[in-house]
């Protein structure tokens, strides 16, 4: 039953950030018991509400998959604590993956990604599932062409990141959204904040 609280926490953080006017200094997520210092946020991708909202839109958009049937949220379902409930996740065409989808709550605090640790940042990680044939199975040029053909996406990319849809901009936006998905008040959060 913690899922509604986690989702509410993520939405509260987004609403807090929405108070920032365009052109202002990057807004920060509300501190989570003093844990901000542990979040790895690249200098070239500070947490900003407009980028997070673009990332959220992309995260839930099935057009990122090869056949338009799956999105990041298909396996990282907010109703299931941003995970899924099966031992092996399935991707486009019902293909079974080799592992289940890990929960992505608090992944902004991570320092390595994928089961083998091959990605050192969320920006590096997010493009992997998009192109993996057992997950979203898309060709990156095709995804970028679909996004570029959508005038609302072109406007949102330009407004948030100052560019047309590119692989780097796509990765930065989704990574920002994933960083905004935080639990906020677990026992571990309180421990790291010094409340033992």
Question: What residue spans do the PLM features occupy?
Answer:
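Bacterial N-terminal signal peptides
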Residues: 7-18
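Periplasmic c-type cytochrome electron-transfer domains
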Residues: 3-5, 19-196
């Amino acid at each position: 039953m913690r899922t509604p609280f986690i989702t509410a926490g993520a939405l509260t953080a987004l609403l807090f950030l929405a108070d920032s006017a365009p052109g202002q200094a990057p807004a920060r997520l509300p501190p989570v018991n003093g844990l901000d210092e542990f979040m790895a946020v690249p200098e070239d991708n500070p947490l900003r509400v407009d980028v997070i909202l673009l990332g959220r839109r992309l995260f839930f958009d099935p057009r990122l998959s090869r056949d338009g049937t799956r999105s990041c949220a298909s396996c990282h379902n907010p109703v299931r604590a941003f995970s899924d409930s099966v031992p092996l996740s399935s991707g486009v065409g019902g293909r079974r993956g080799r592992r289940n989808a890990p929960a992505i709550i608090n992944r902004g605090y991570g320092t390595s990604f994928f089961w083998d640790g091959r990605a050192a940042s969320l920006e590096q990680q997010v493009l992997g599932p998009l192109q993996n044939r057992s997950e979203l199975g898309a060709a990156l040029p095709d995804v970028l062409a679909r996004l570029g053909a959508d005038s609302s996406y072109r406007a949102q990319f330009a407004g948030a990141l100052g560019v047309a849809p590119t692989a780097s901009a796509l990765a930065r936006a989704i990574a920002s959204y994933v960083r905004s998905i935080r639990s906020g008040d677990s026992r571990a959060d309180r421990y790291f904040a010094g409340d033992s």
